[in-house]
């Protein structure tokens, strides 16, 4: 409560293993984000959309815990802002690979490639309440990678293949692969 009184929006770990009512609590307190949101009723989704709470889905967690994957179509149809993250941790999430998470999101959670990429970039920025990252527009930080691939879609379809040709942070080149491994040559 003290944080809310000082302008901080809470974040909540919600409904990972069961529908425990945490998503309704997240909506009630207008949380910035509710992470996991694996088990969500239609009422939960409507409440999240109404409150502006971003639901952050964590595909690698369901992979590790063998929980059912949420159907992202339900979240989008309800008007929920969705983010994707890895939640890499030593207990239930063993991968920090965003391409792996994107591949699961597209293959098992009914995201389109474009929806998955948006959720992992701009959706994540919205969950963090950051307007300066997650997109390439005037005034943004310009943090991005250039892929060594024929299309951005390969990031999702080839998650185990090294595809990064260069990395930029705040518009400055910080890393490049002078001889990128290319399965496309």
Model-predicted segments: where are they?
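Metal-dependent enolase-superfamily TIM-barrel catalytic cores that perform enediolate-based chemistry
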Residues: 1-20
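Short, electropositive alpha-helical surface patch
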Residues: 2-4, 70, 145
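Active-site-adjacent C-terminal substructures of enzyme catalytic domains
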Residues: 9, 19-135, 159, 174
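Active-site flanking residues adjacent to catalytic metal/cofactor-binding acidic residues
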Residues: 12, 84-86, 142, 147
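C-terminal cap of metal-dependent C-N hydrolases
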Residues: 120, 141-185
């Amino acid at each position: 409560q003290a944080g809310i009184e000082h302008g901080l929006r809470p974040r909540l770990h919600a409904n990972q293993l069961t529908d425990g009512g945490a998503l309704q609590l997240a909506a009630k307190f207008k949380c910035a984000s509710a992470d996991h949101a694996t088990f969500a009723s239609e009422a939960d989704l409507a409440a999240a959309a109404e409150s502006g709470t971003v639901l952050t889905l964590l595909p690698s967690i369901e992979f590790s815990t063998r929980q059912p994957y949420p159907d992202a179509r339900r979240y989008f149809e309800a008007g929920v802002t969705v983010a994707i993250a890895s939640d890499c941790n030593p207990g239930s999430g063993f991968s920090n690979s965003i391409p792996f998470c994107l591949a699961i999101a597209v293959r098992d959670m009914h995201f389109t490639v474009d929806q998955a990429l948006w959720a992992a970039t701009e959706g994540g920025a919205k969950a963090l309440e950051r307007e300066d990252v997650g997109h390439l527009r005037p005034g943004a930080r310009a943090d991005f990678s250039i892929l060594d691939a024929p299309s951005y879609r390969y990031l999702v379809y080839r998650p185990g293949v090294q595809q990064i040709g260069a990395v930029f942070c705040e518009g400055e080149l910080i890393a490049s692969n002078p001889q990128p491994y290319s399965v496309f040559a």
